[in-house]
Amino acid sequence: MALAKAASINDDIHDLTMRAFRCYVLDLVEQYEGGHPGSAMGMVAMGIALWKYTMKYSTNDPTWFNRDRFVLSNGHVCLFQYLFQHLSGLKSMTEKQLKSYHSSDYHSKCPGHPEIENEAVEVTTGPLGQGISNSVGLAIASKNLGALYNKPGYEVVNNTTYCIVGDACLQEGPALESISFAGHLGLDNLVVIYDNNQVCCDGSVDIANTEDISAKFRACNWNVIEVEDGARDVATIVKALELAGAEKNRPTLINVRTIIGTDSAFQNHCAAHGSALGEEGIRELKIKYGFNPSQKFHFPQEVYDFFSDIPAKGDEYVSNWNKLVSSYVKEFPELGAEFQSRVKGELPKNWKSLLPNNLPNEDTATRTSARAMVRALAKDVPNVIAGSADLSVSVNLPWPGSKYFENPQLATQCGLAGDYSGRYVEFGIREHCMCAIANGLAAFNKGTFLPITSSFYMFYLYAAPALRMAALQELKAIHIATHDSIGAGEDGPTHQPIAQSALWRAMPNFYYMRPGDASEVRGLFEKAVELPLSTLFSLSRHEVPQYPGKSSIELAKRGGYVFEDAKDADIQLIGAGSELEQAVKTARILRSRGLKVRILSFPCQRLFDEQSVGYRRSVLQRGKVPTVVIEAYVAYGWERYATAGYTMNTFGKSLPVEDVYEYFGFNPSEISKKIEGYVRAVKANPDLLYEFIDLTEKPKHDQNHL
């Protein structure tokens, strides 16, 4: 049932603002004949309710720590956000900047989707469903900080996250995962506002979706409020937002019925989604609204006056909060100092000393070594918030004394309990939203949180769009991906991620790390914490040898290094990750046959690429020595470093780990034969050094054997 219409407030100025706003949107889209006008025109009443009456923010200090967060999940409607930033007094959002929308201006602050680099934009949105998932992360961040640091009379963190979604967002997988999870957690500091215009790119929404959205949210433990005339009724939307703010124990959906392209010739038509109306259509609407049809890009002074009190109000918010924090620090010196460090985005100064240096000498899976790093760091570093997609039993990240971030009212059948002060999250089987939520945590305030996720490596493919968005936004998280390569063994090809390495190695602003033993795990984990960007660790389930005195904590941080040297080498072997073992054993056989063999360990291509030219040349010796990479992944990407590869060129197989390596020819005896032949071929024809040779044959085992 819809919320009863609220008593009118400021109807005349609301109406003037909405009319002028719609015309301004149309002018901006028309100037370069491109953009998304329709939803921005239909959502103006929502914007007035949020920016004028509800949200707590500062236009003079857009990064104020305790501000309410606003996320436009339907990012194509960015003109809506830019225009309200302009009206509310954000200094960087000038009329000139507004006019740069869809222009050729390299320095435009009005890109086609909101981007985190620009002021007052919390997260980059565009791929639908990401923004609402990020919003859950932002809400978790606030809940966690409040539970850890708030004291009676000192609510130093009490902000709300507001997120606008459209019909399309609510059809995307990560959104559905996040809606379910937010309801489960009872995040009452999250308010999602649904721009329900029932129109999509291809027509009306019912061509593909006829579900009851409100019923779905209620089933997911959301408080649901419905507003009938969302295109015009500012007062009722304000009332709905007030009710959302009063709700305890549940997030709120405000289902606002709007009209795409309101009052224009393409009202309620899919053409309003992403097309310019045309000069004649704009002229007709301006005349209908009582405006001068020849006047473009114009807000009446009364509209600016209506929003003019917002900067001063924001200054007051910031001043009062600073005074509160100052008193808080005096009242709680130790906790206050920690809180101030979190606000600055600082890790404890001693964090490196927390990482274990007593590394194993016996065969150990790299996932086990990584687990030791995470546990040691998380135990005493409050910035760390870690979790898994229902694989905690396998990845085993919870540290001694860890508390679960959980709805405090939840009583689980298995006895697991927690509250909002916990820092270990059970995400359920929701890999995509797990990583998108990690982005929200990272974006809350850079450095305040260090999100660490974990799952089987194969399942990070479900989360690829979220990891790409982390890279795009330069957000920092660490992802612990276990059961890599064909080492997942009996689980078979569905769980053996033989092709994913190429994706992550190619991703800009992203570090893919595949350590070969515990020393490399130690060095690379330290490096990952230092880096400002996201990292994915590719880790073995099976045990691998340790190489004290050969593998190097410090050299691993350089991405690639000389593991075993040889003067005037006949062949170089690159070992990566768990296949470093194959390189070492193959080298022994080749040496026994009279070849001089150099071994390179290569756990991270991007780190290696960042080294000096001199260092890279000293390690690789390109053009001088034939170089074979040995890795149980596809070869794509290794052409830049090696001249040949013993790699995977087919999907995996369900066999015990030793047998699956044998099945695909990953045994030193077989590899050494291929490499020996390759060395002879290169000596006979040196031109082979200048093309990449695949030394792997597809398995020829009898498929008909019963």
Curated annotation (Swiss-Prot):
Chain ranges for the short sequence motif Microbody targeting signal as given in the UniProt record: 704-706
Positions of the record's site feature: Important for catalytic activity: 36, 273
Binding locations of thiamine diphosphate: 76, 126-128, 197, 273, 431, 459
Keyword Cytoplasm belongs to the record: no
Keyword Repressor: no
Cofactor(s) listed in the protein's UniProt record: Mg(2+); Ca(2+); Mn(2+); Co(2+)
Residues that bind Mg(2+): 167, 197, 199
Compartment(s) of residence: Peroxisome
Cofactor binding mode and count: Binds 1 Mg(2+) ion per subunit. Can also utilize other divalent metal cations, such as Ca(2+), Mn(2+) and Co(2+). Binds 1 thiamine pyrophosphate per subunit.
Swiss-Prot/TrEMBL GO biological process terms: methanol metabolic process; pentose-phosphate shunt
Entry EC no(s): 2.2.1.3
GO molecular function list: formaldehyde transketolase activity; metal ion binding; transketolase activity
Known role: Involved in assimilation of formaldehyde.
Protein name (Swiss-Prot/TrEMBL): Dihydroxyacetone synthase
